[in-house]
Swiss-Prot record:
GO terms for biological process, alphabetical: diaminopimelate biosynthetic process; lysine biosynthetic process via diaminopimelate
PROSITE patterns from the UniProt entry: DAPB
Residues the record marks as active site: 133, 137
EC number: 1.17.1.8
Alphabetized Pfam families for the sequence: DapB_C, DapB_N
Binding-site residues, (S)-2,3,4,5-tetrahydrodipicolinate: 134, 143-144
InterPro entries on file: DapB_C (IPR022663), DapB_N (IPR000846), DapB_N_CS (IPR022664), DHDPR_bac (IPR023940), NAD(P)-bd_dom_sf (IPR036291)
A GO molecular-function annotation: 4-hydroxy-tetrahydrodipicolinate reductase
Its job: Catalyzes the conversion of 4-hydroxy-tetrahydrodipicolinate (HTPA) to tetrahydrodipicolinate.
Entry keyword set: Amino-acid biosynthesis, Cytoplasm, Diaminopimelate biosynthesis, Lysine biosynthesis, NAD, NADP, Oxidoreductase
Cellular component, GO, one term: cytosol
Protein name: 4-hydroxy-tetrahydrodipicolinate reductase
Species of the source: Corynebacterium jeikeium (strain K411)
Amino acid sequence: MTRIGVLGARGRVGSAVVAAVEADANHELVAAIDHGDDLQALVDNKAEVVVDFTVPDAVMGNLEFCINNGIHAVVGTTGWTEERFETVRGWLQESPETGVLVAPNFAISAVLTMKFAEIAAPFFESAEVVELHHPNKVDAPSGTAVHTAEGIARARKAAGLAEQPDATTQSLDGARGADVQGVPVHAVRMTGMVAHEQVIFGTKGQTLTLKQDSYDRESFVPGIMIGVDKIGDNPGLTIGLEKFLGLDGDVNGGAKA
């Protein structure tokens, strides 16, 4: 039985994880921590794995504490940069048996969409990403959209494709979206949305649209629990859930950081 601590336990995703752990005979909830609570409860209650769905300002301190105490971490908190990843890698060098999984999205449908986008990318001249989220999301574009665009860019580069055709010379600021390695990414923030993504491909005479929708935050729970079950066998930093689903094949060159 895996002993689990949840950080951000009173948040929308965190509360769904708490409910899932409590309902599963193979996992034991030993700490449910939220803003203002003491992380020492993780050590005192012998947590083996932490699930972190907090905020960008808190996640680095949480991870430093967990790594220093040999507690594996499954992280869905947003706001990641390469500098932050490098910091985590440095901490993990001092705790080589500890594993940290950071995933831009834990919905299995979203992970598959990212994979399908990489597969499709070499066959189309043009590709753009549109992500749609609730208005309380603090980062734009989403980590999922950035991860999707980066995968598309890698696949296009590997296939030797030229830059995407775009004759735009006059536009309002932001009209063509954010440029992620040559792939335009557009962010929508709208009441009534939860987490959604569209990837649109085009070439002569045809288009392909991949569409993914998460209507409820419970959609993230199955992927989170896969991460919880497998992180102990994967020391170091892993970015993306693909590896744990067996999807880190030749197309994306592997998800191991």
